């Protein structure tokens, strides 16, 4: 079960405060690349800034968690007005622990959100917090990522959660790799 998420959605923007309430979640640790924007893009994807504002208005704590370096993470976090952890070394639990502390919550109140099985999902499960898997916004072009995405196929969620408390963003995402 280390490689399986609690649930899967097409987009981070499909996550609602109602869904998080149902899960008992008060804070989210958010991956950046291919979760909130395309890989290495300094601008949030359409709808993400409004989604962040809506989550914050509902009292949901948000913290960015990335394996990337400060020059990538800091400006992106600043634009969204969010706290962050960079060089998190996912799937190791150090970054998750630091993010939970920054949010001032217990791990029982936090979920992780990301698009990669071997970093985001595995790391969340090792830290023992639920993971909401979102399909990547686009396919990466490097050979390493193409290889990694192929290795993820057996563990990809087979069903997208579409309960009544899920926003329907309309974004398709990459449903098959």
What is the predicted function of each stretch?
Residues 2-30, 41-42, 46-60, 65-112, ...:
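Asp-based, Mg2+/Mn2+-dependent phosphohydrolase catalytic module
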């Amino acid at each position: 079960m280390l490689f399986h998420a609690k649930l899967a959605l097409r987009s981070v923007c499909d996550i609602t405060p109602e869904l998080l309430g149902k899960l008992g979640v008060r804070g989210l640790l958010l991956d950046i690349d291919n979760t909130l924007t395309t890989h290495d893009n300094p601008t949030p994807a359409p709808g993400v800034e409004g989604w962040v504002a809506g989550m914050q208005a509902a009292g949901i704590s948000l913290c960015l968690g990335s394996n990337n370096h400060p020059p990538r993470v800091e400006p992106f976090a600043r634009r969204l007005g969010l706290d962050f952890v960079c060089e998190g070394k996912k799937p190791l639990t150090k970054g998750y622990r630091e993010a939970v502390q920054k949010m001032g919550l217990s791990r029982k109140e936090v979920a992780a959100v990301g698009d990669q099985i071997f970093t985001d999902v595995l790391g969340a499960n090792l830290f023992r917090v639920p993971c909401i898997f979102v399909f990547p916004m686009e396919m990466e072009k490097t050979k390493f990522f193409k290889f990694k995405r192929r290795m993820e196929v057996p563990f990809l969620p087979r069903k997208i959660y579409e309960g009544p408390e899920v926003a329907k963003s309309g974004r398709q995402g990459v449903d098959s790799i």
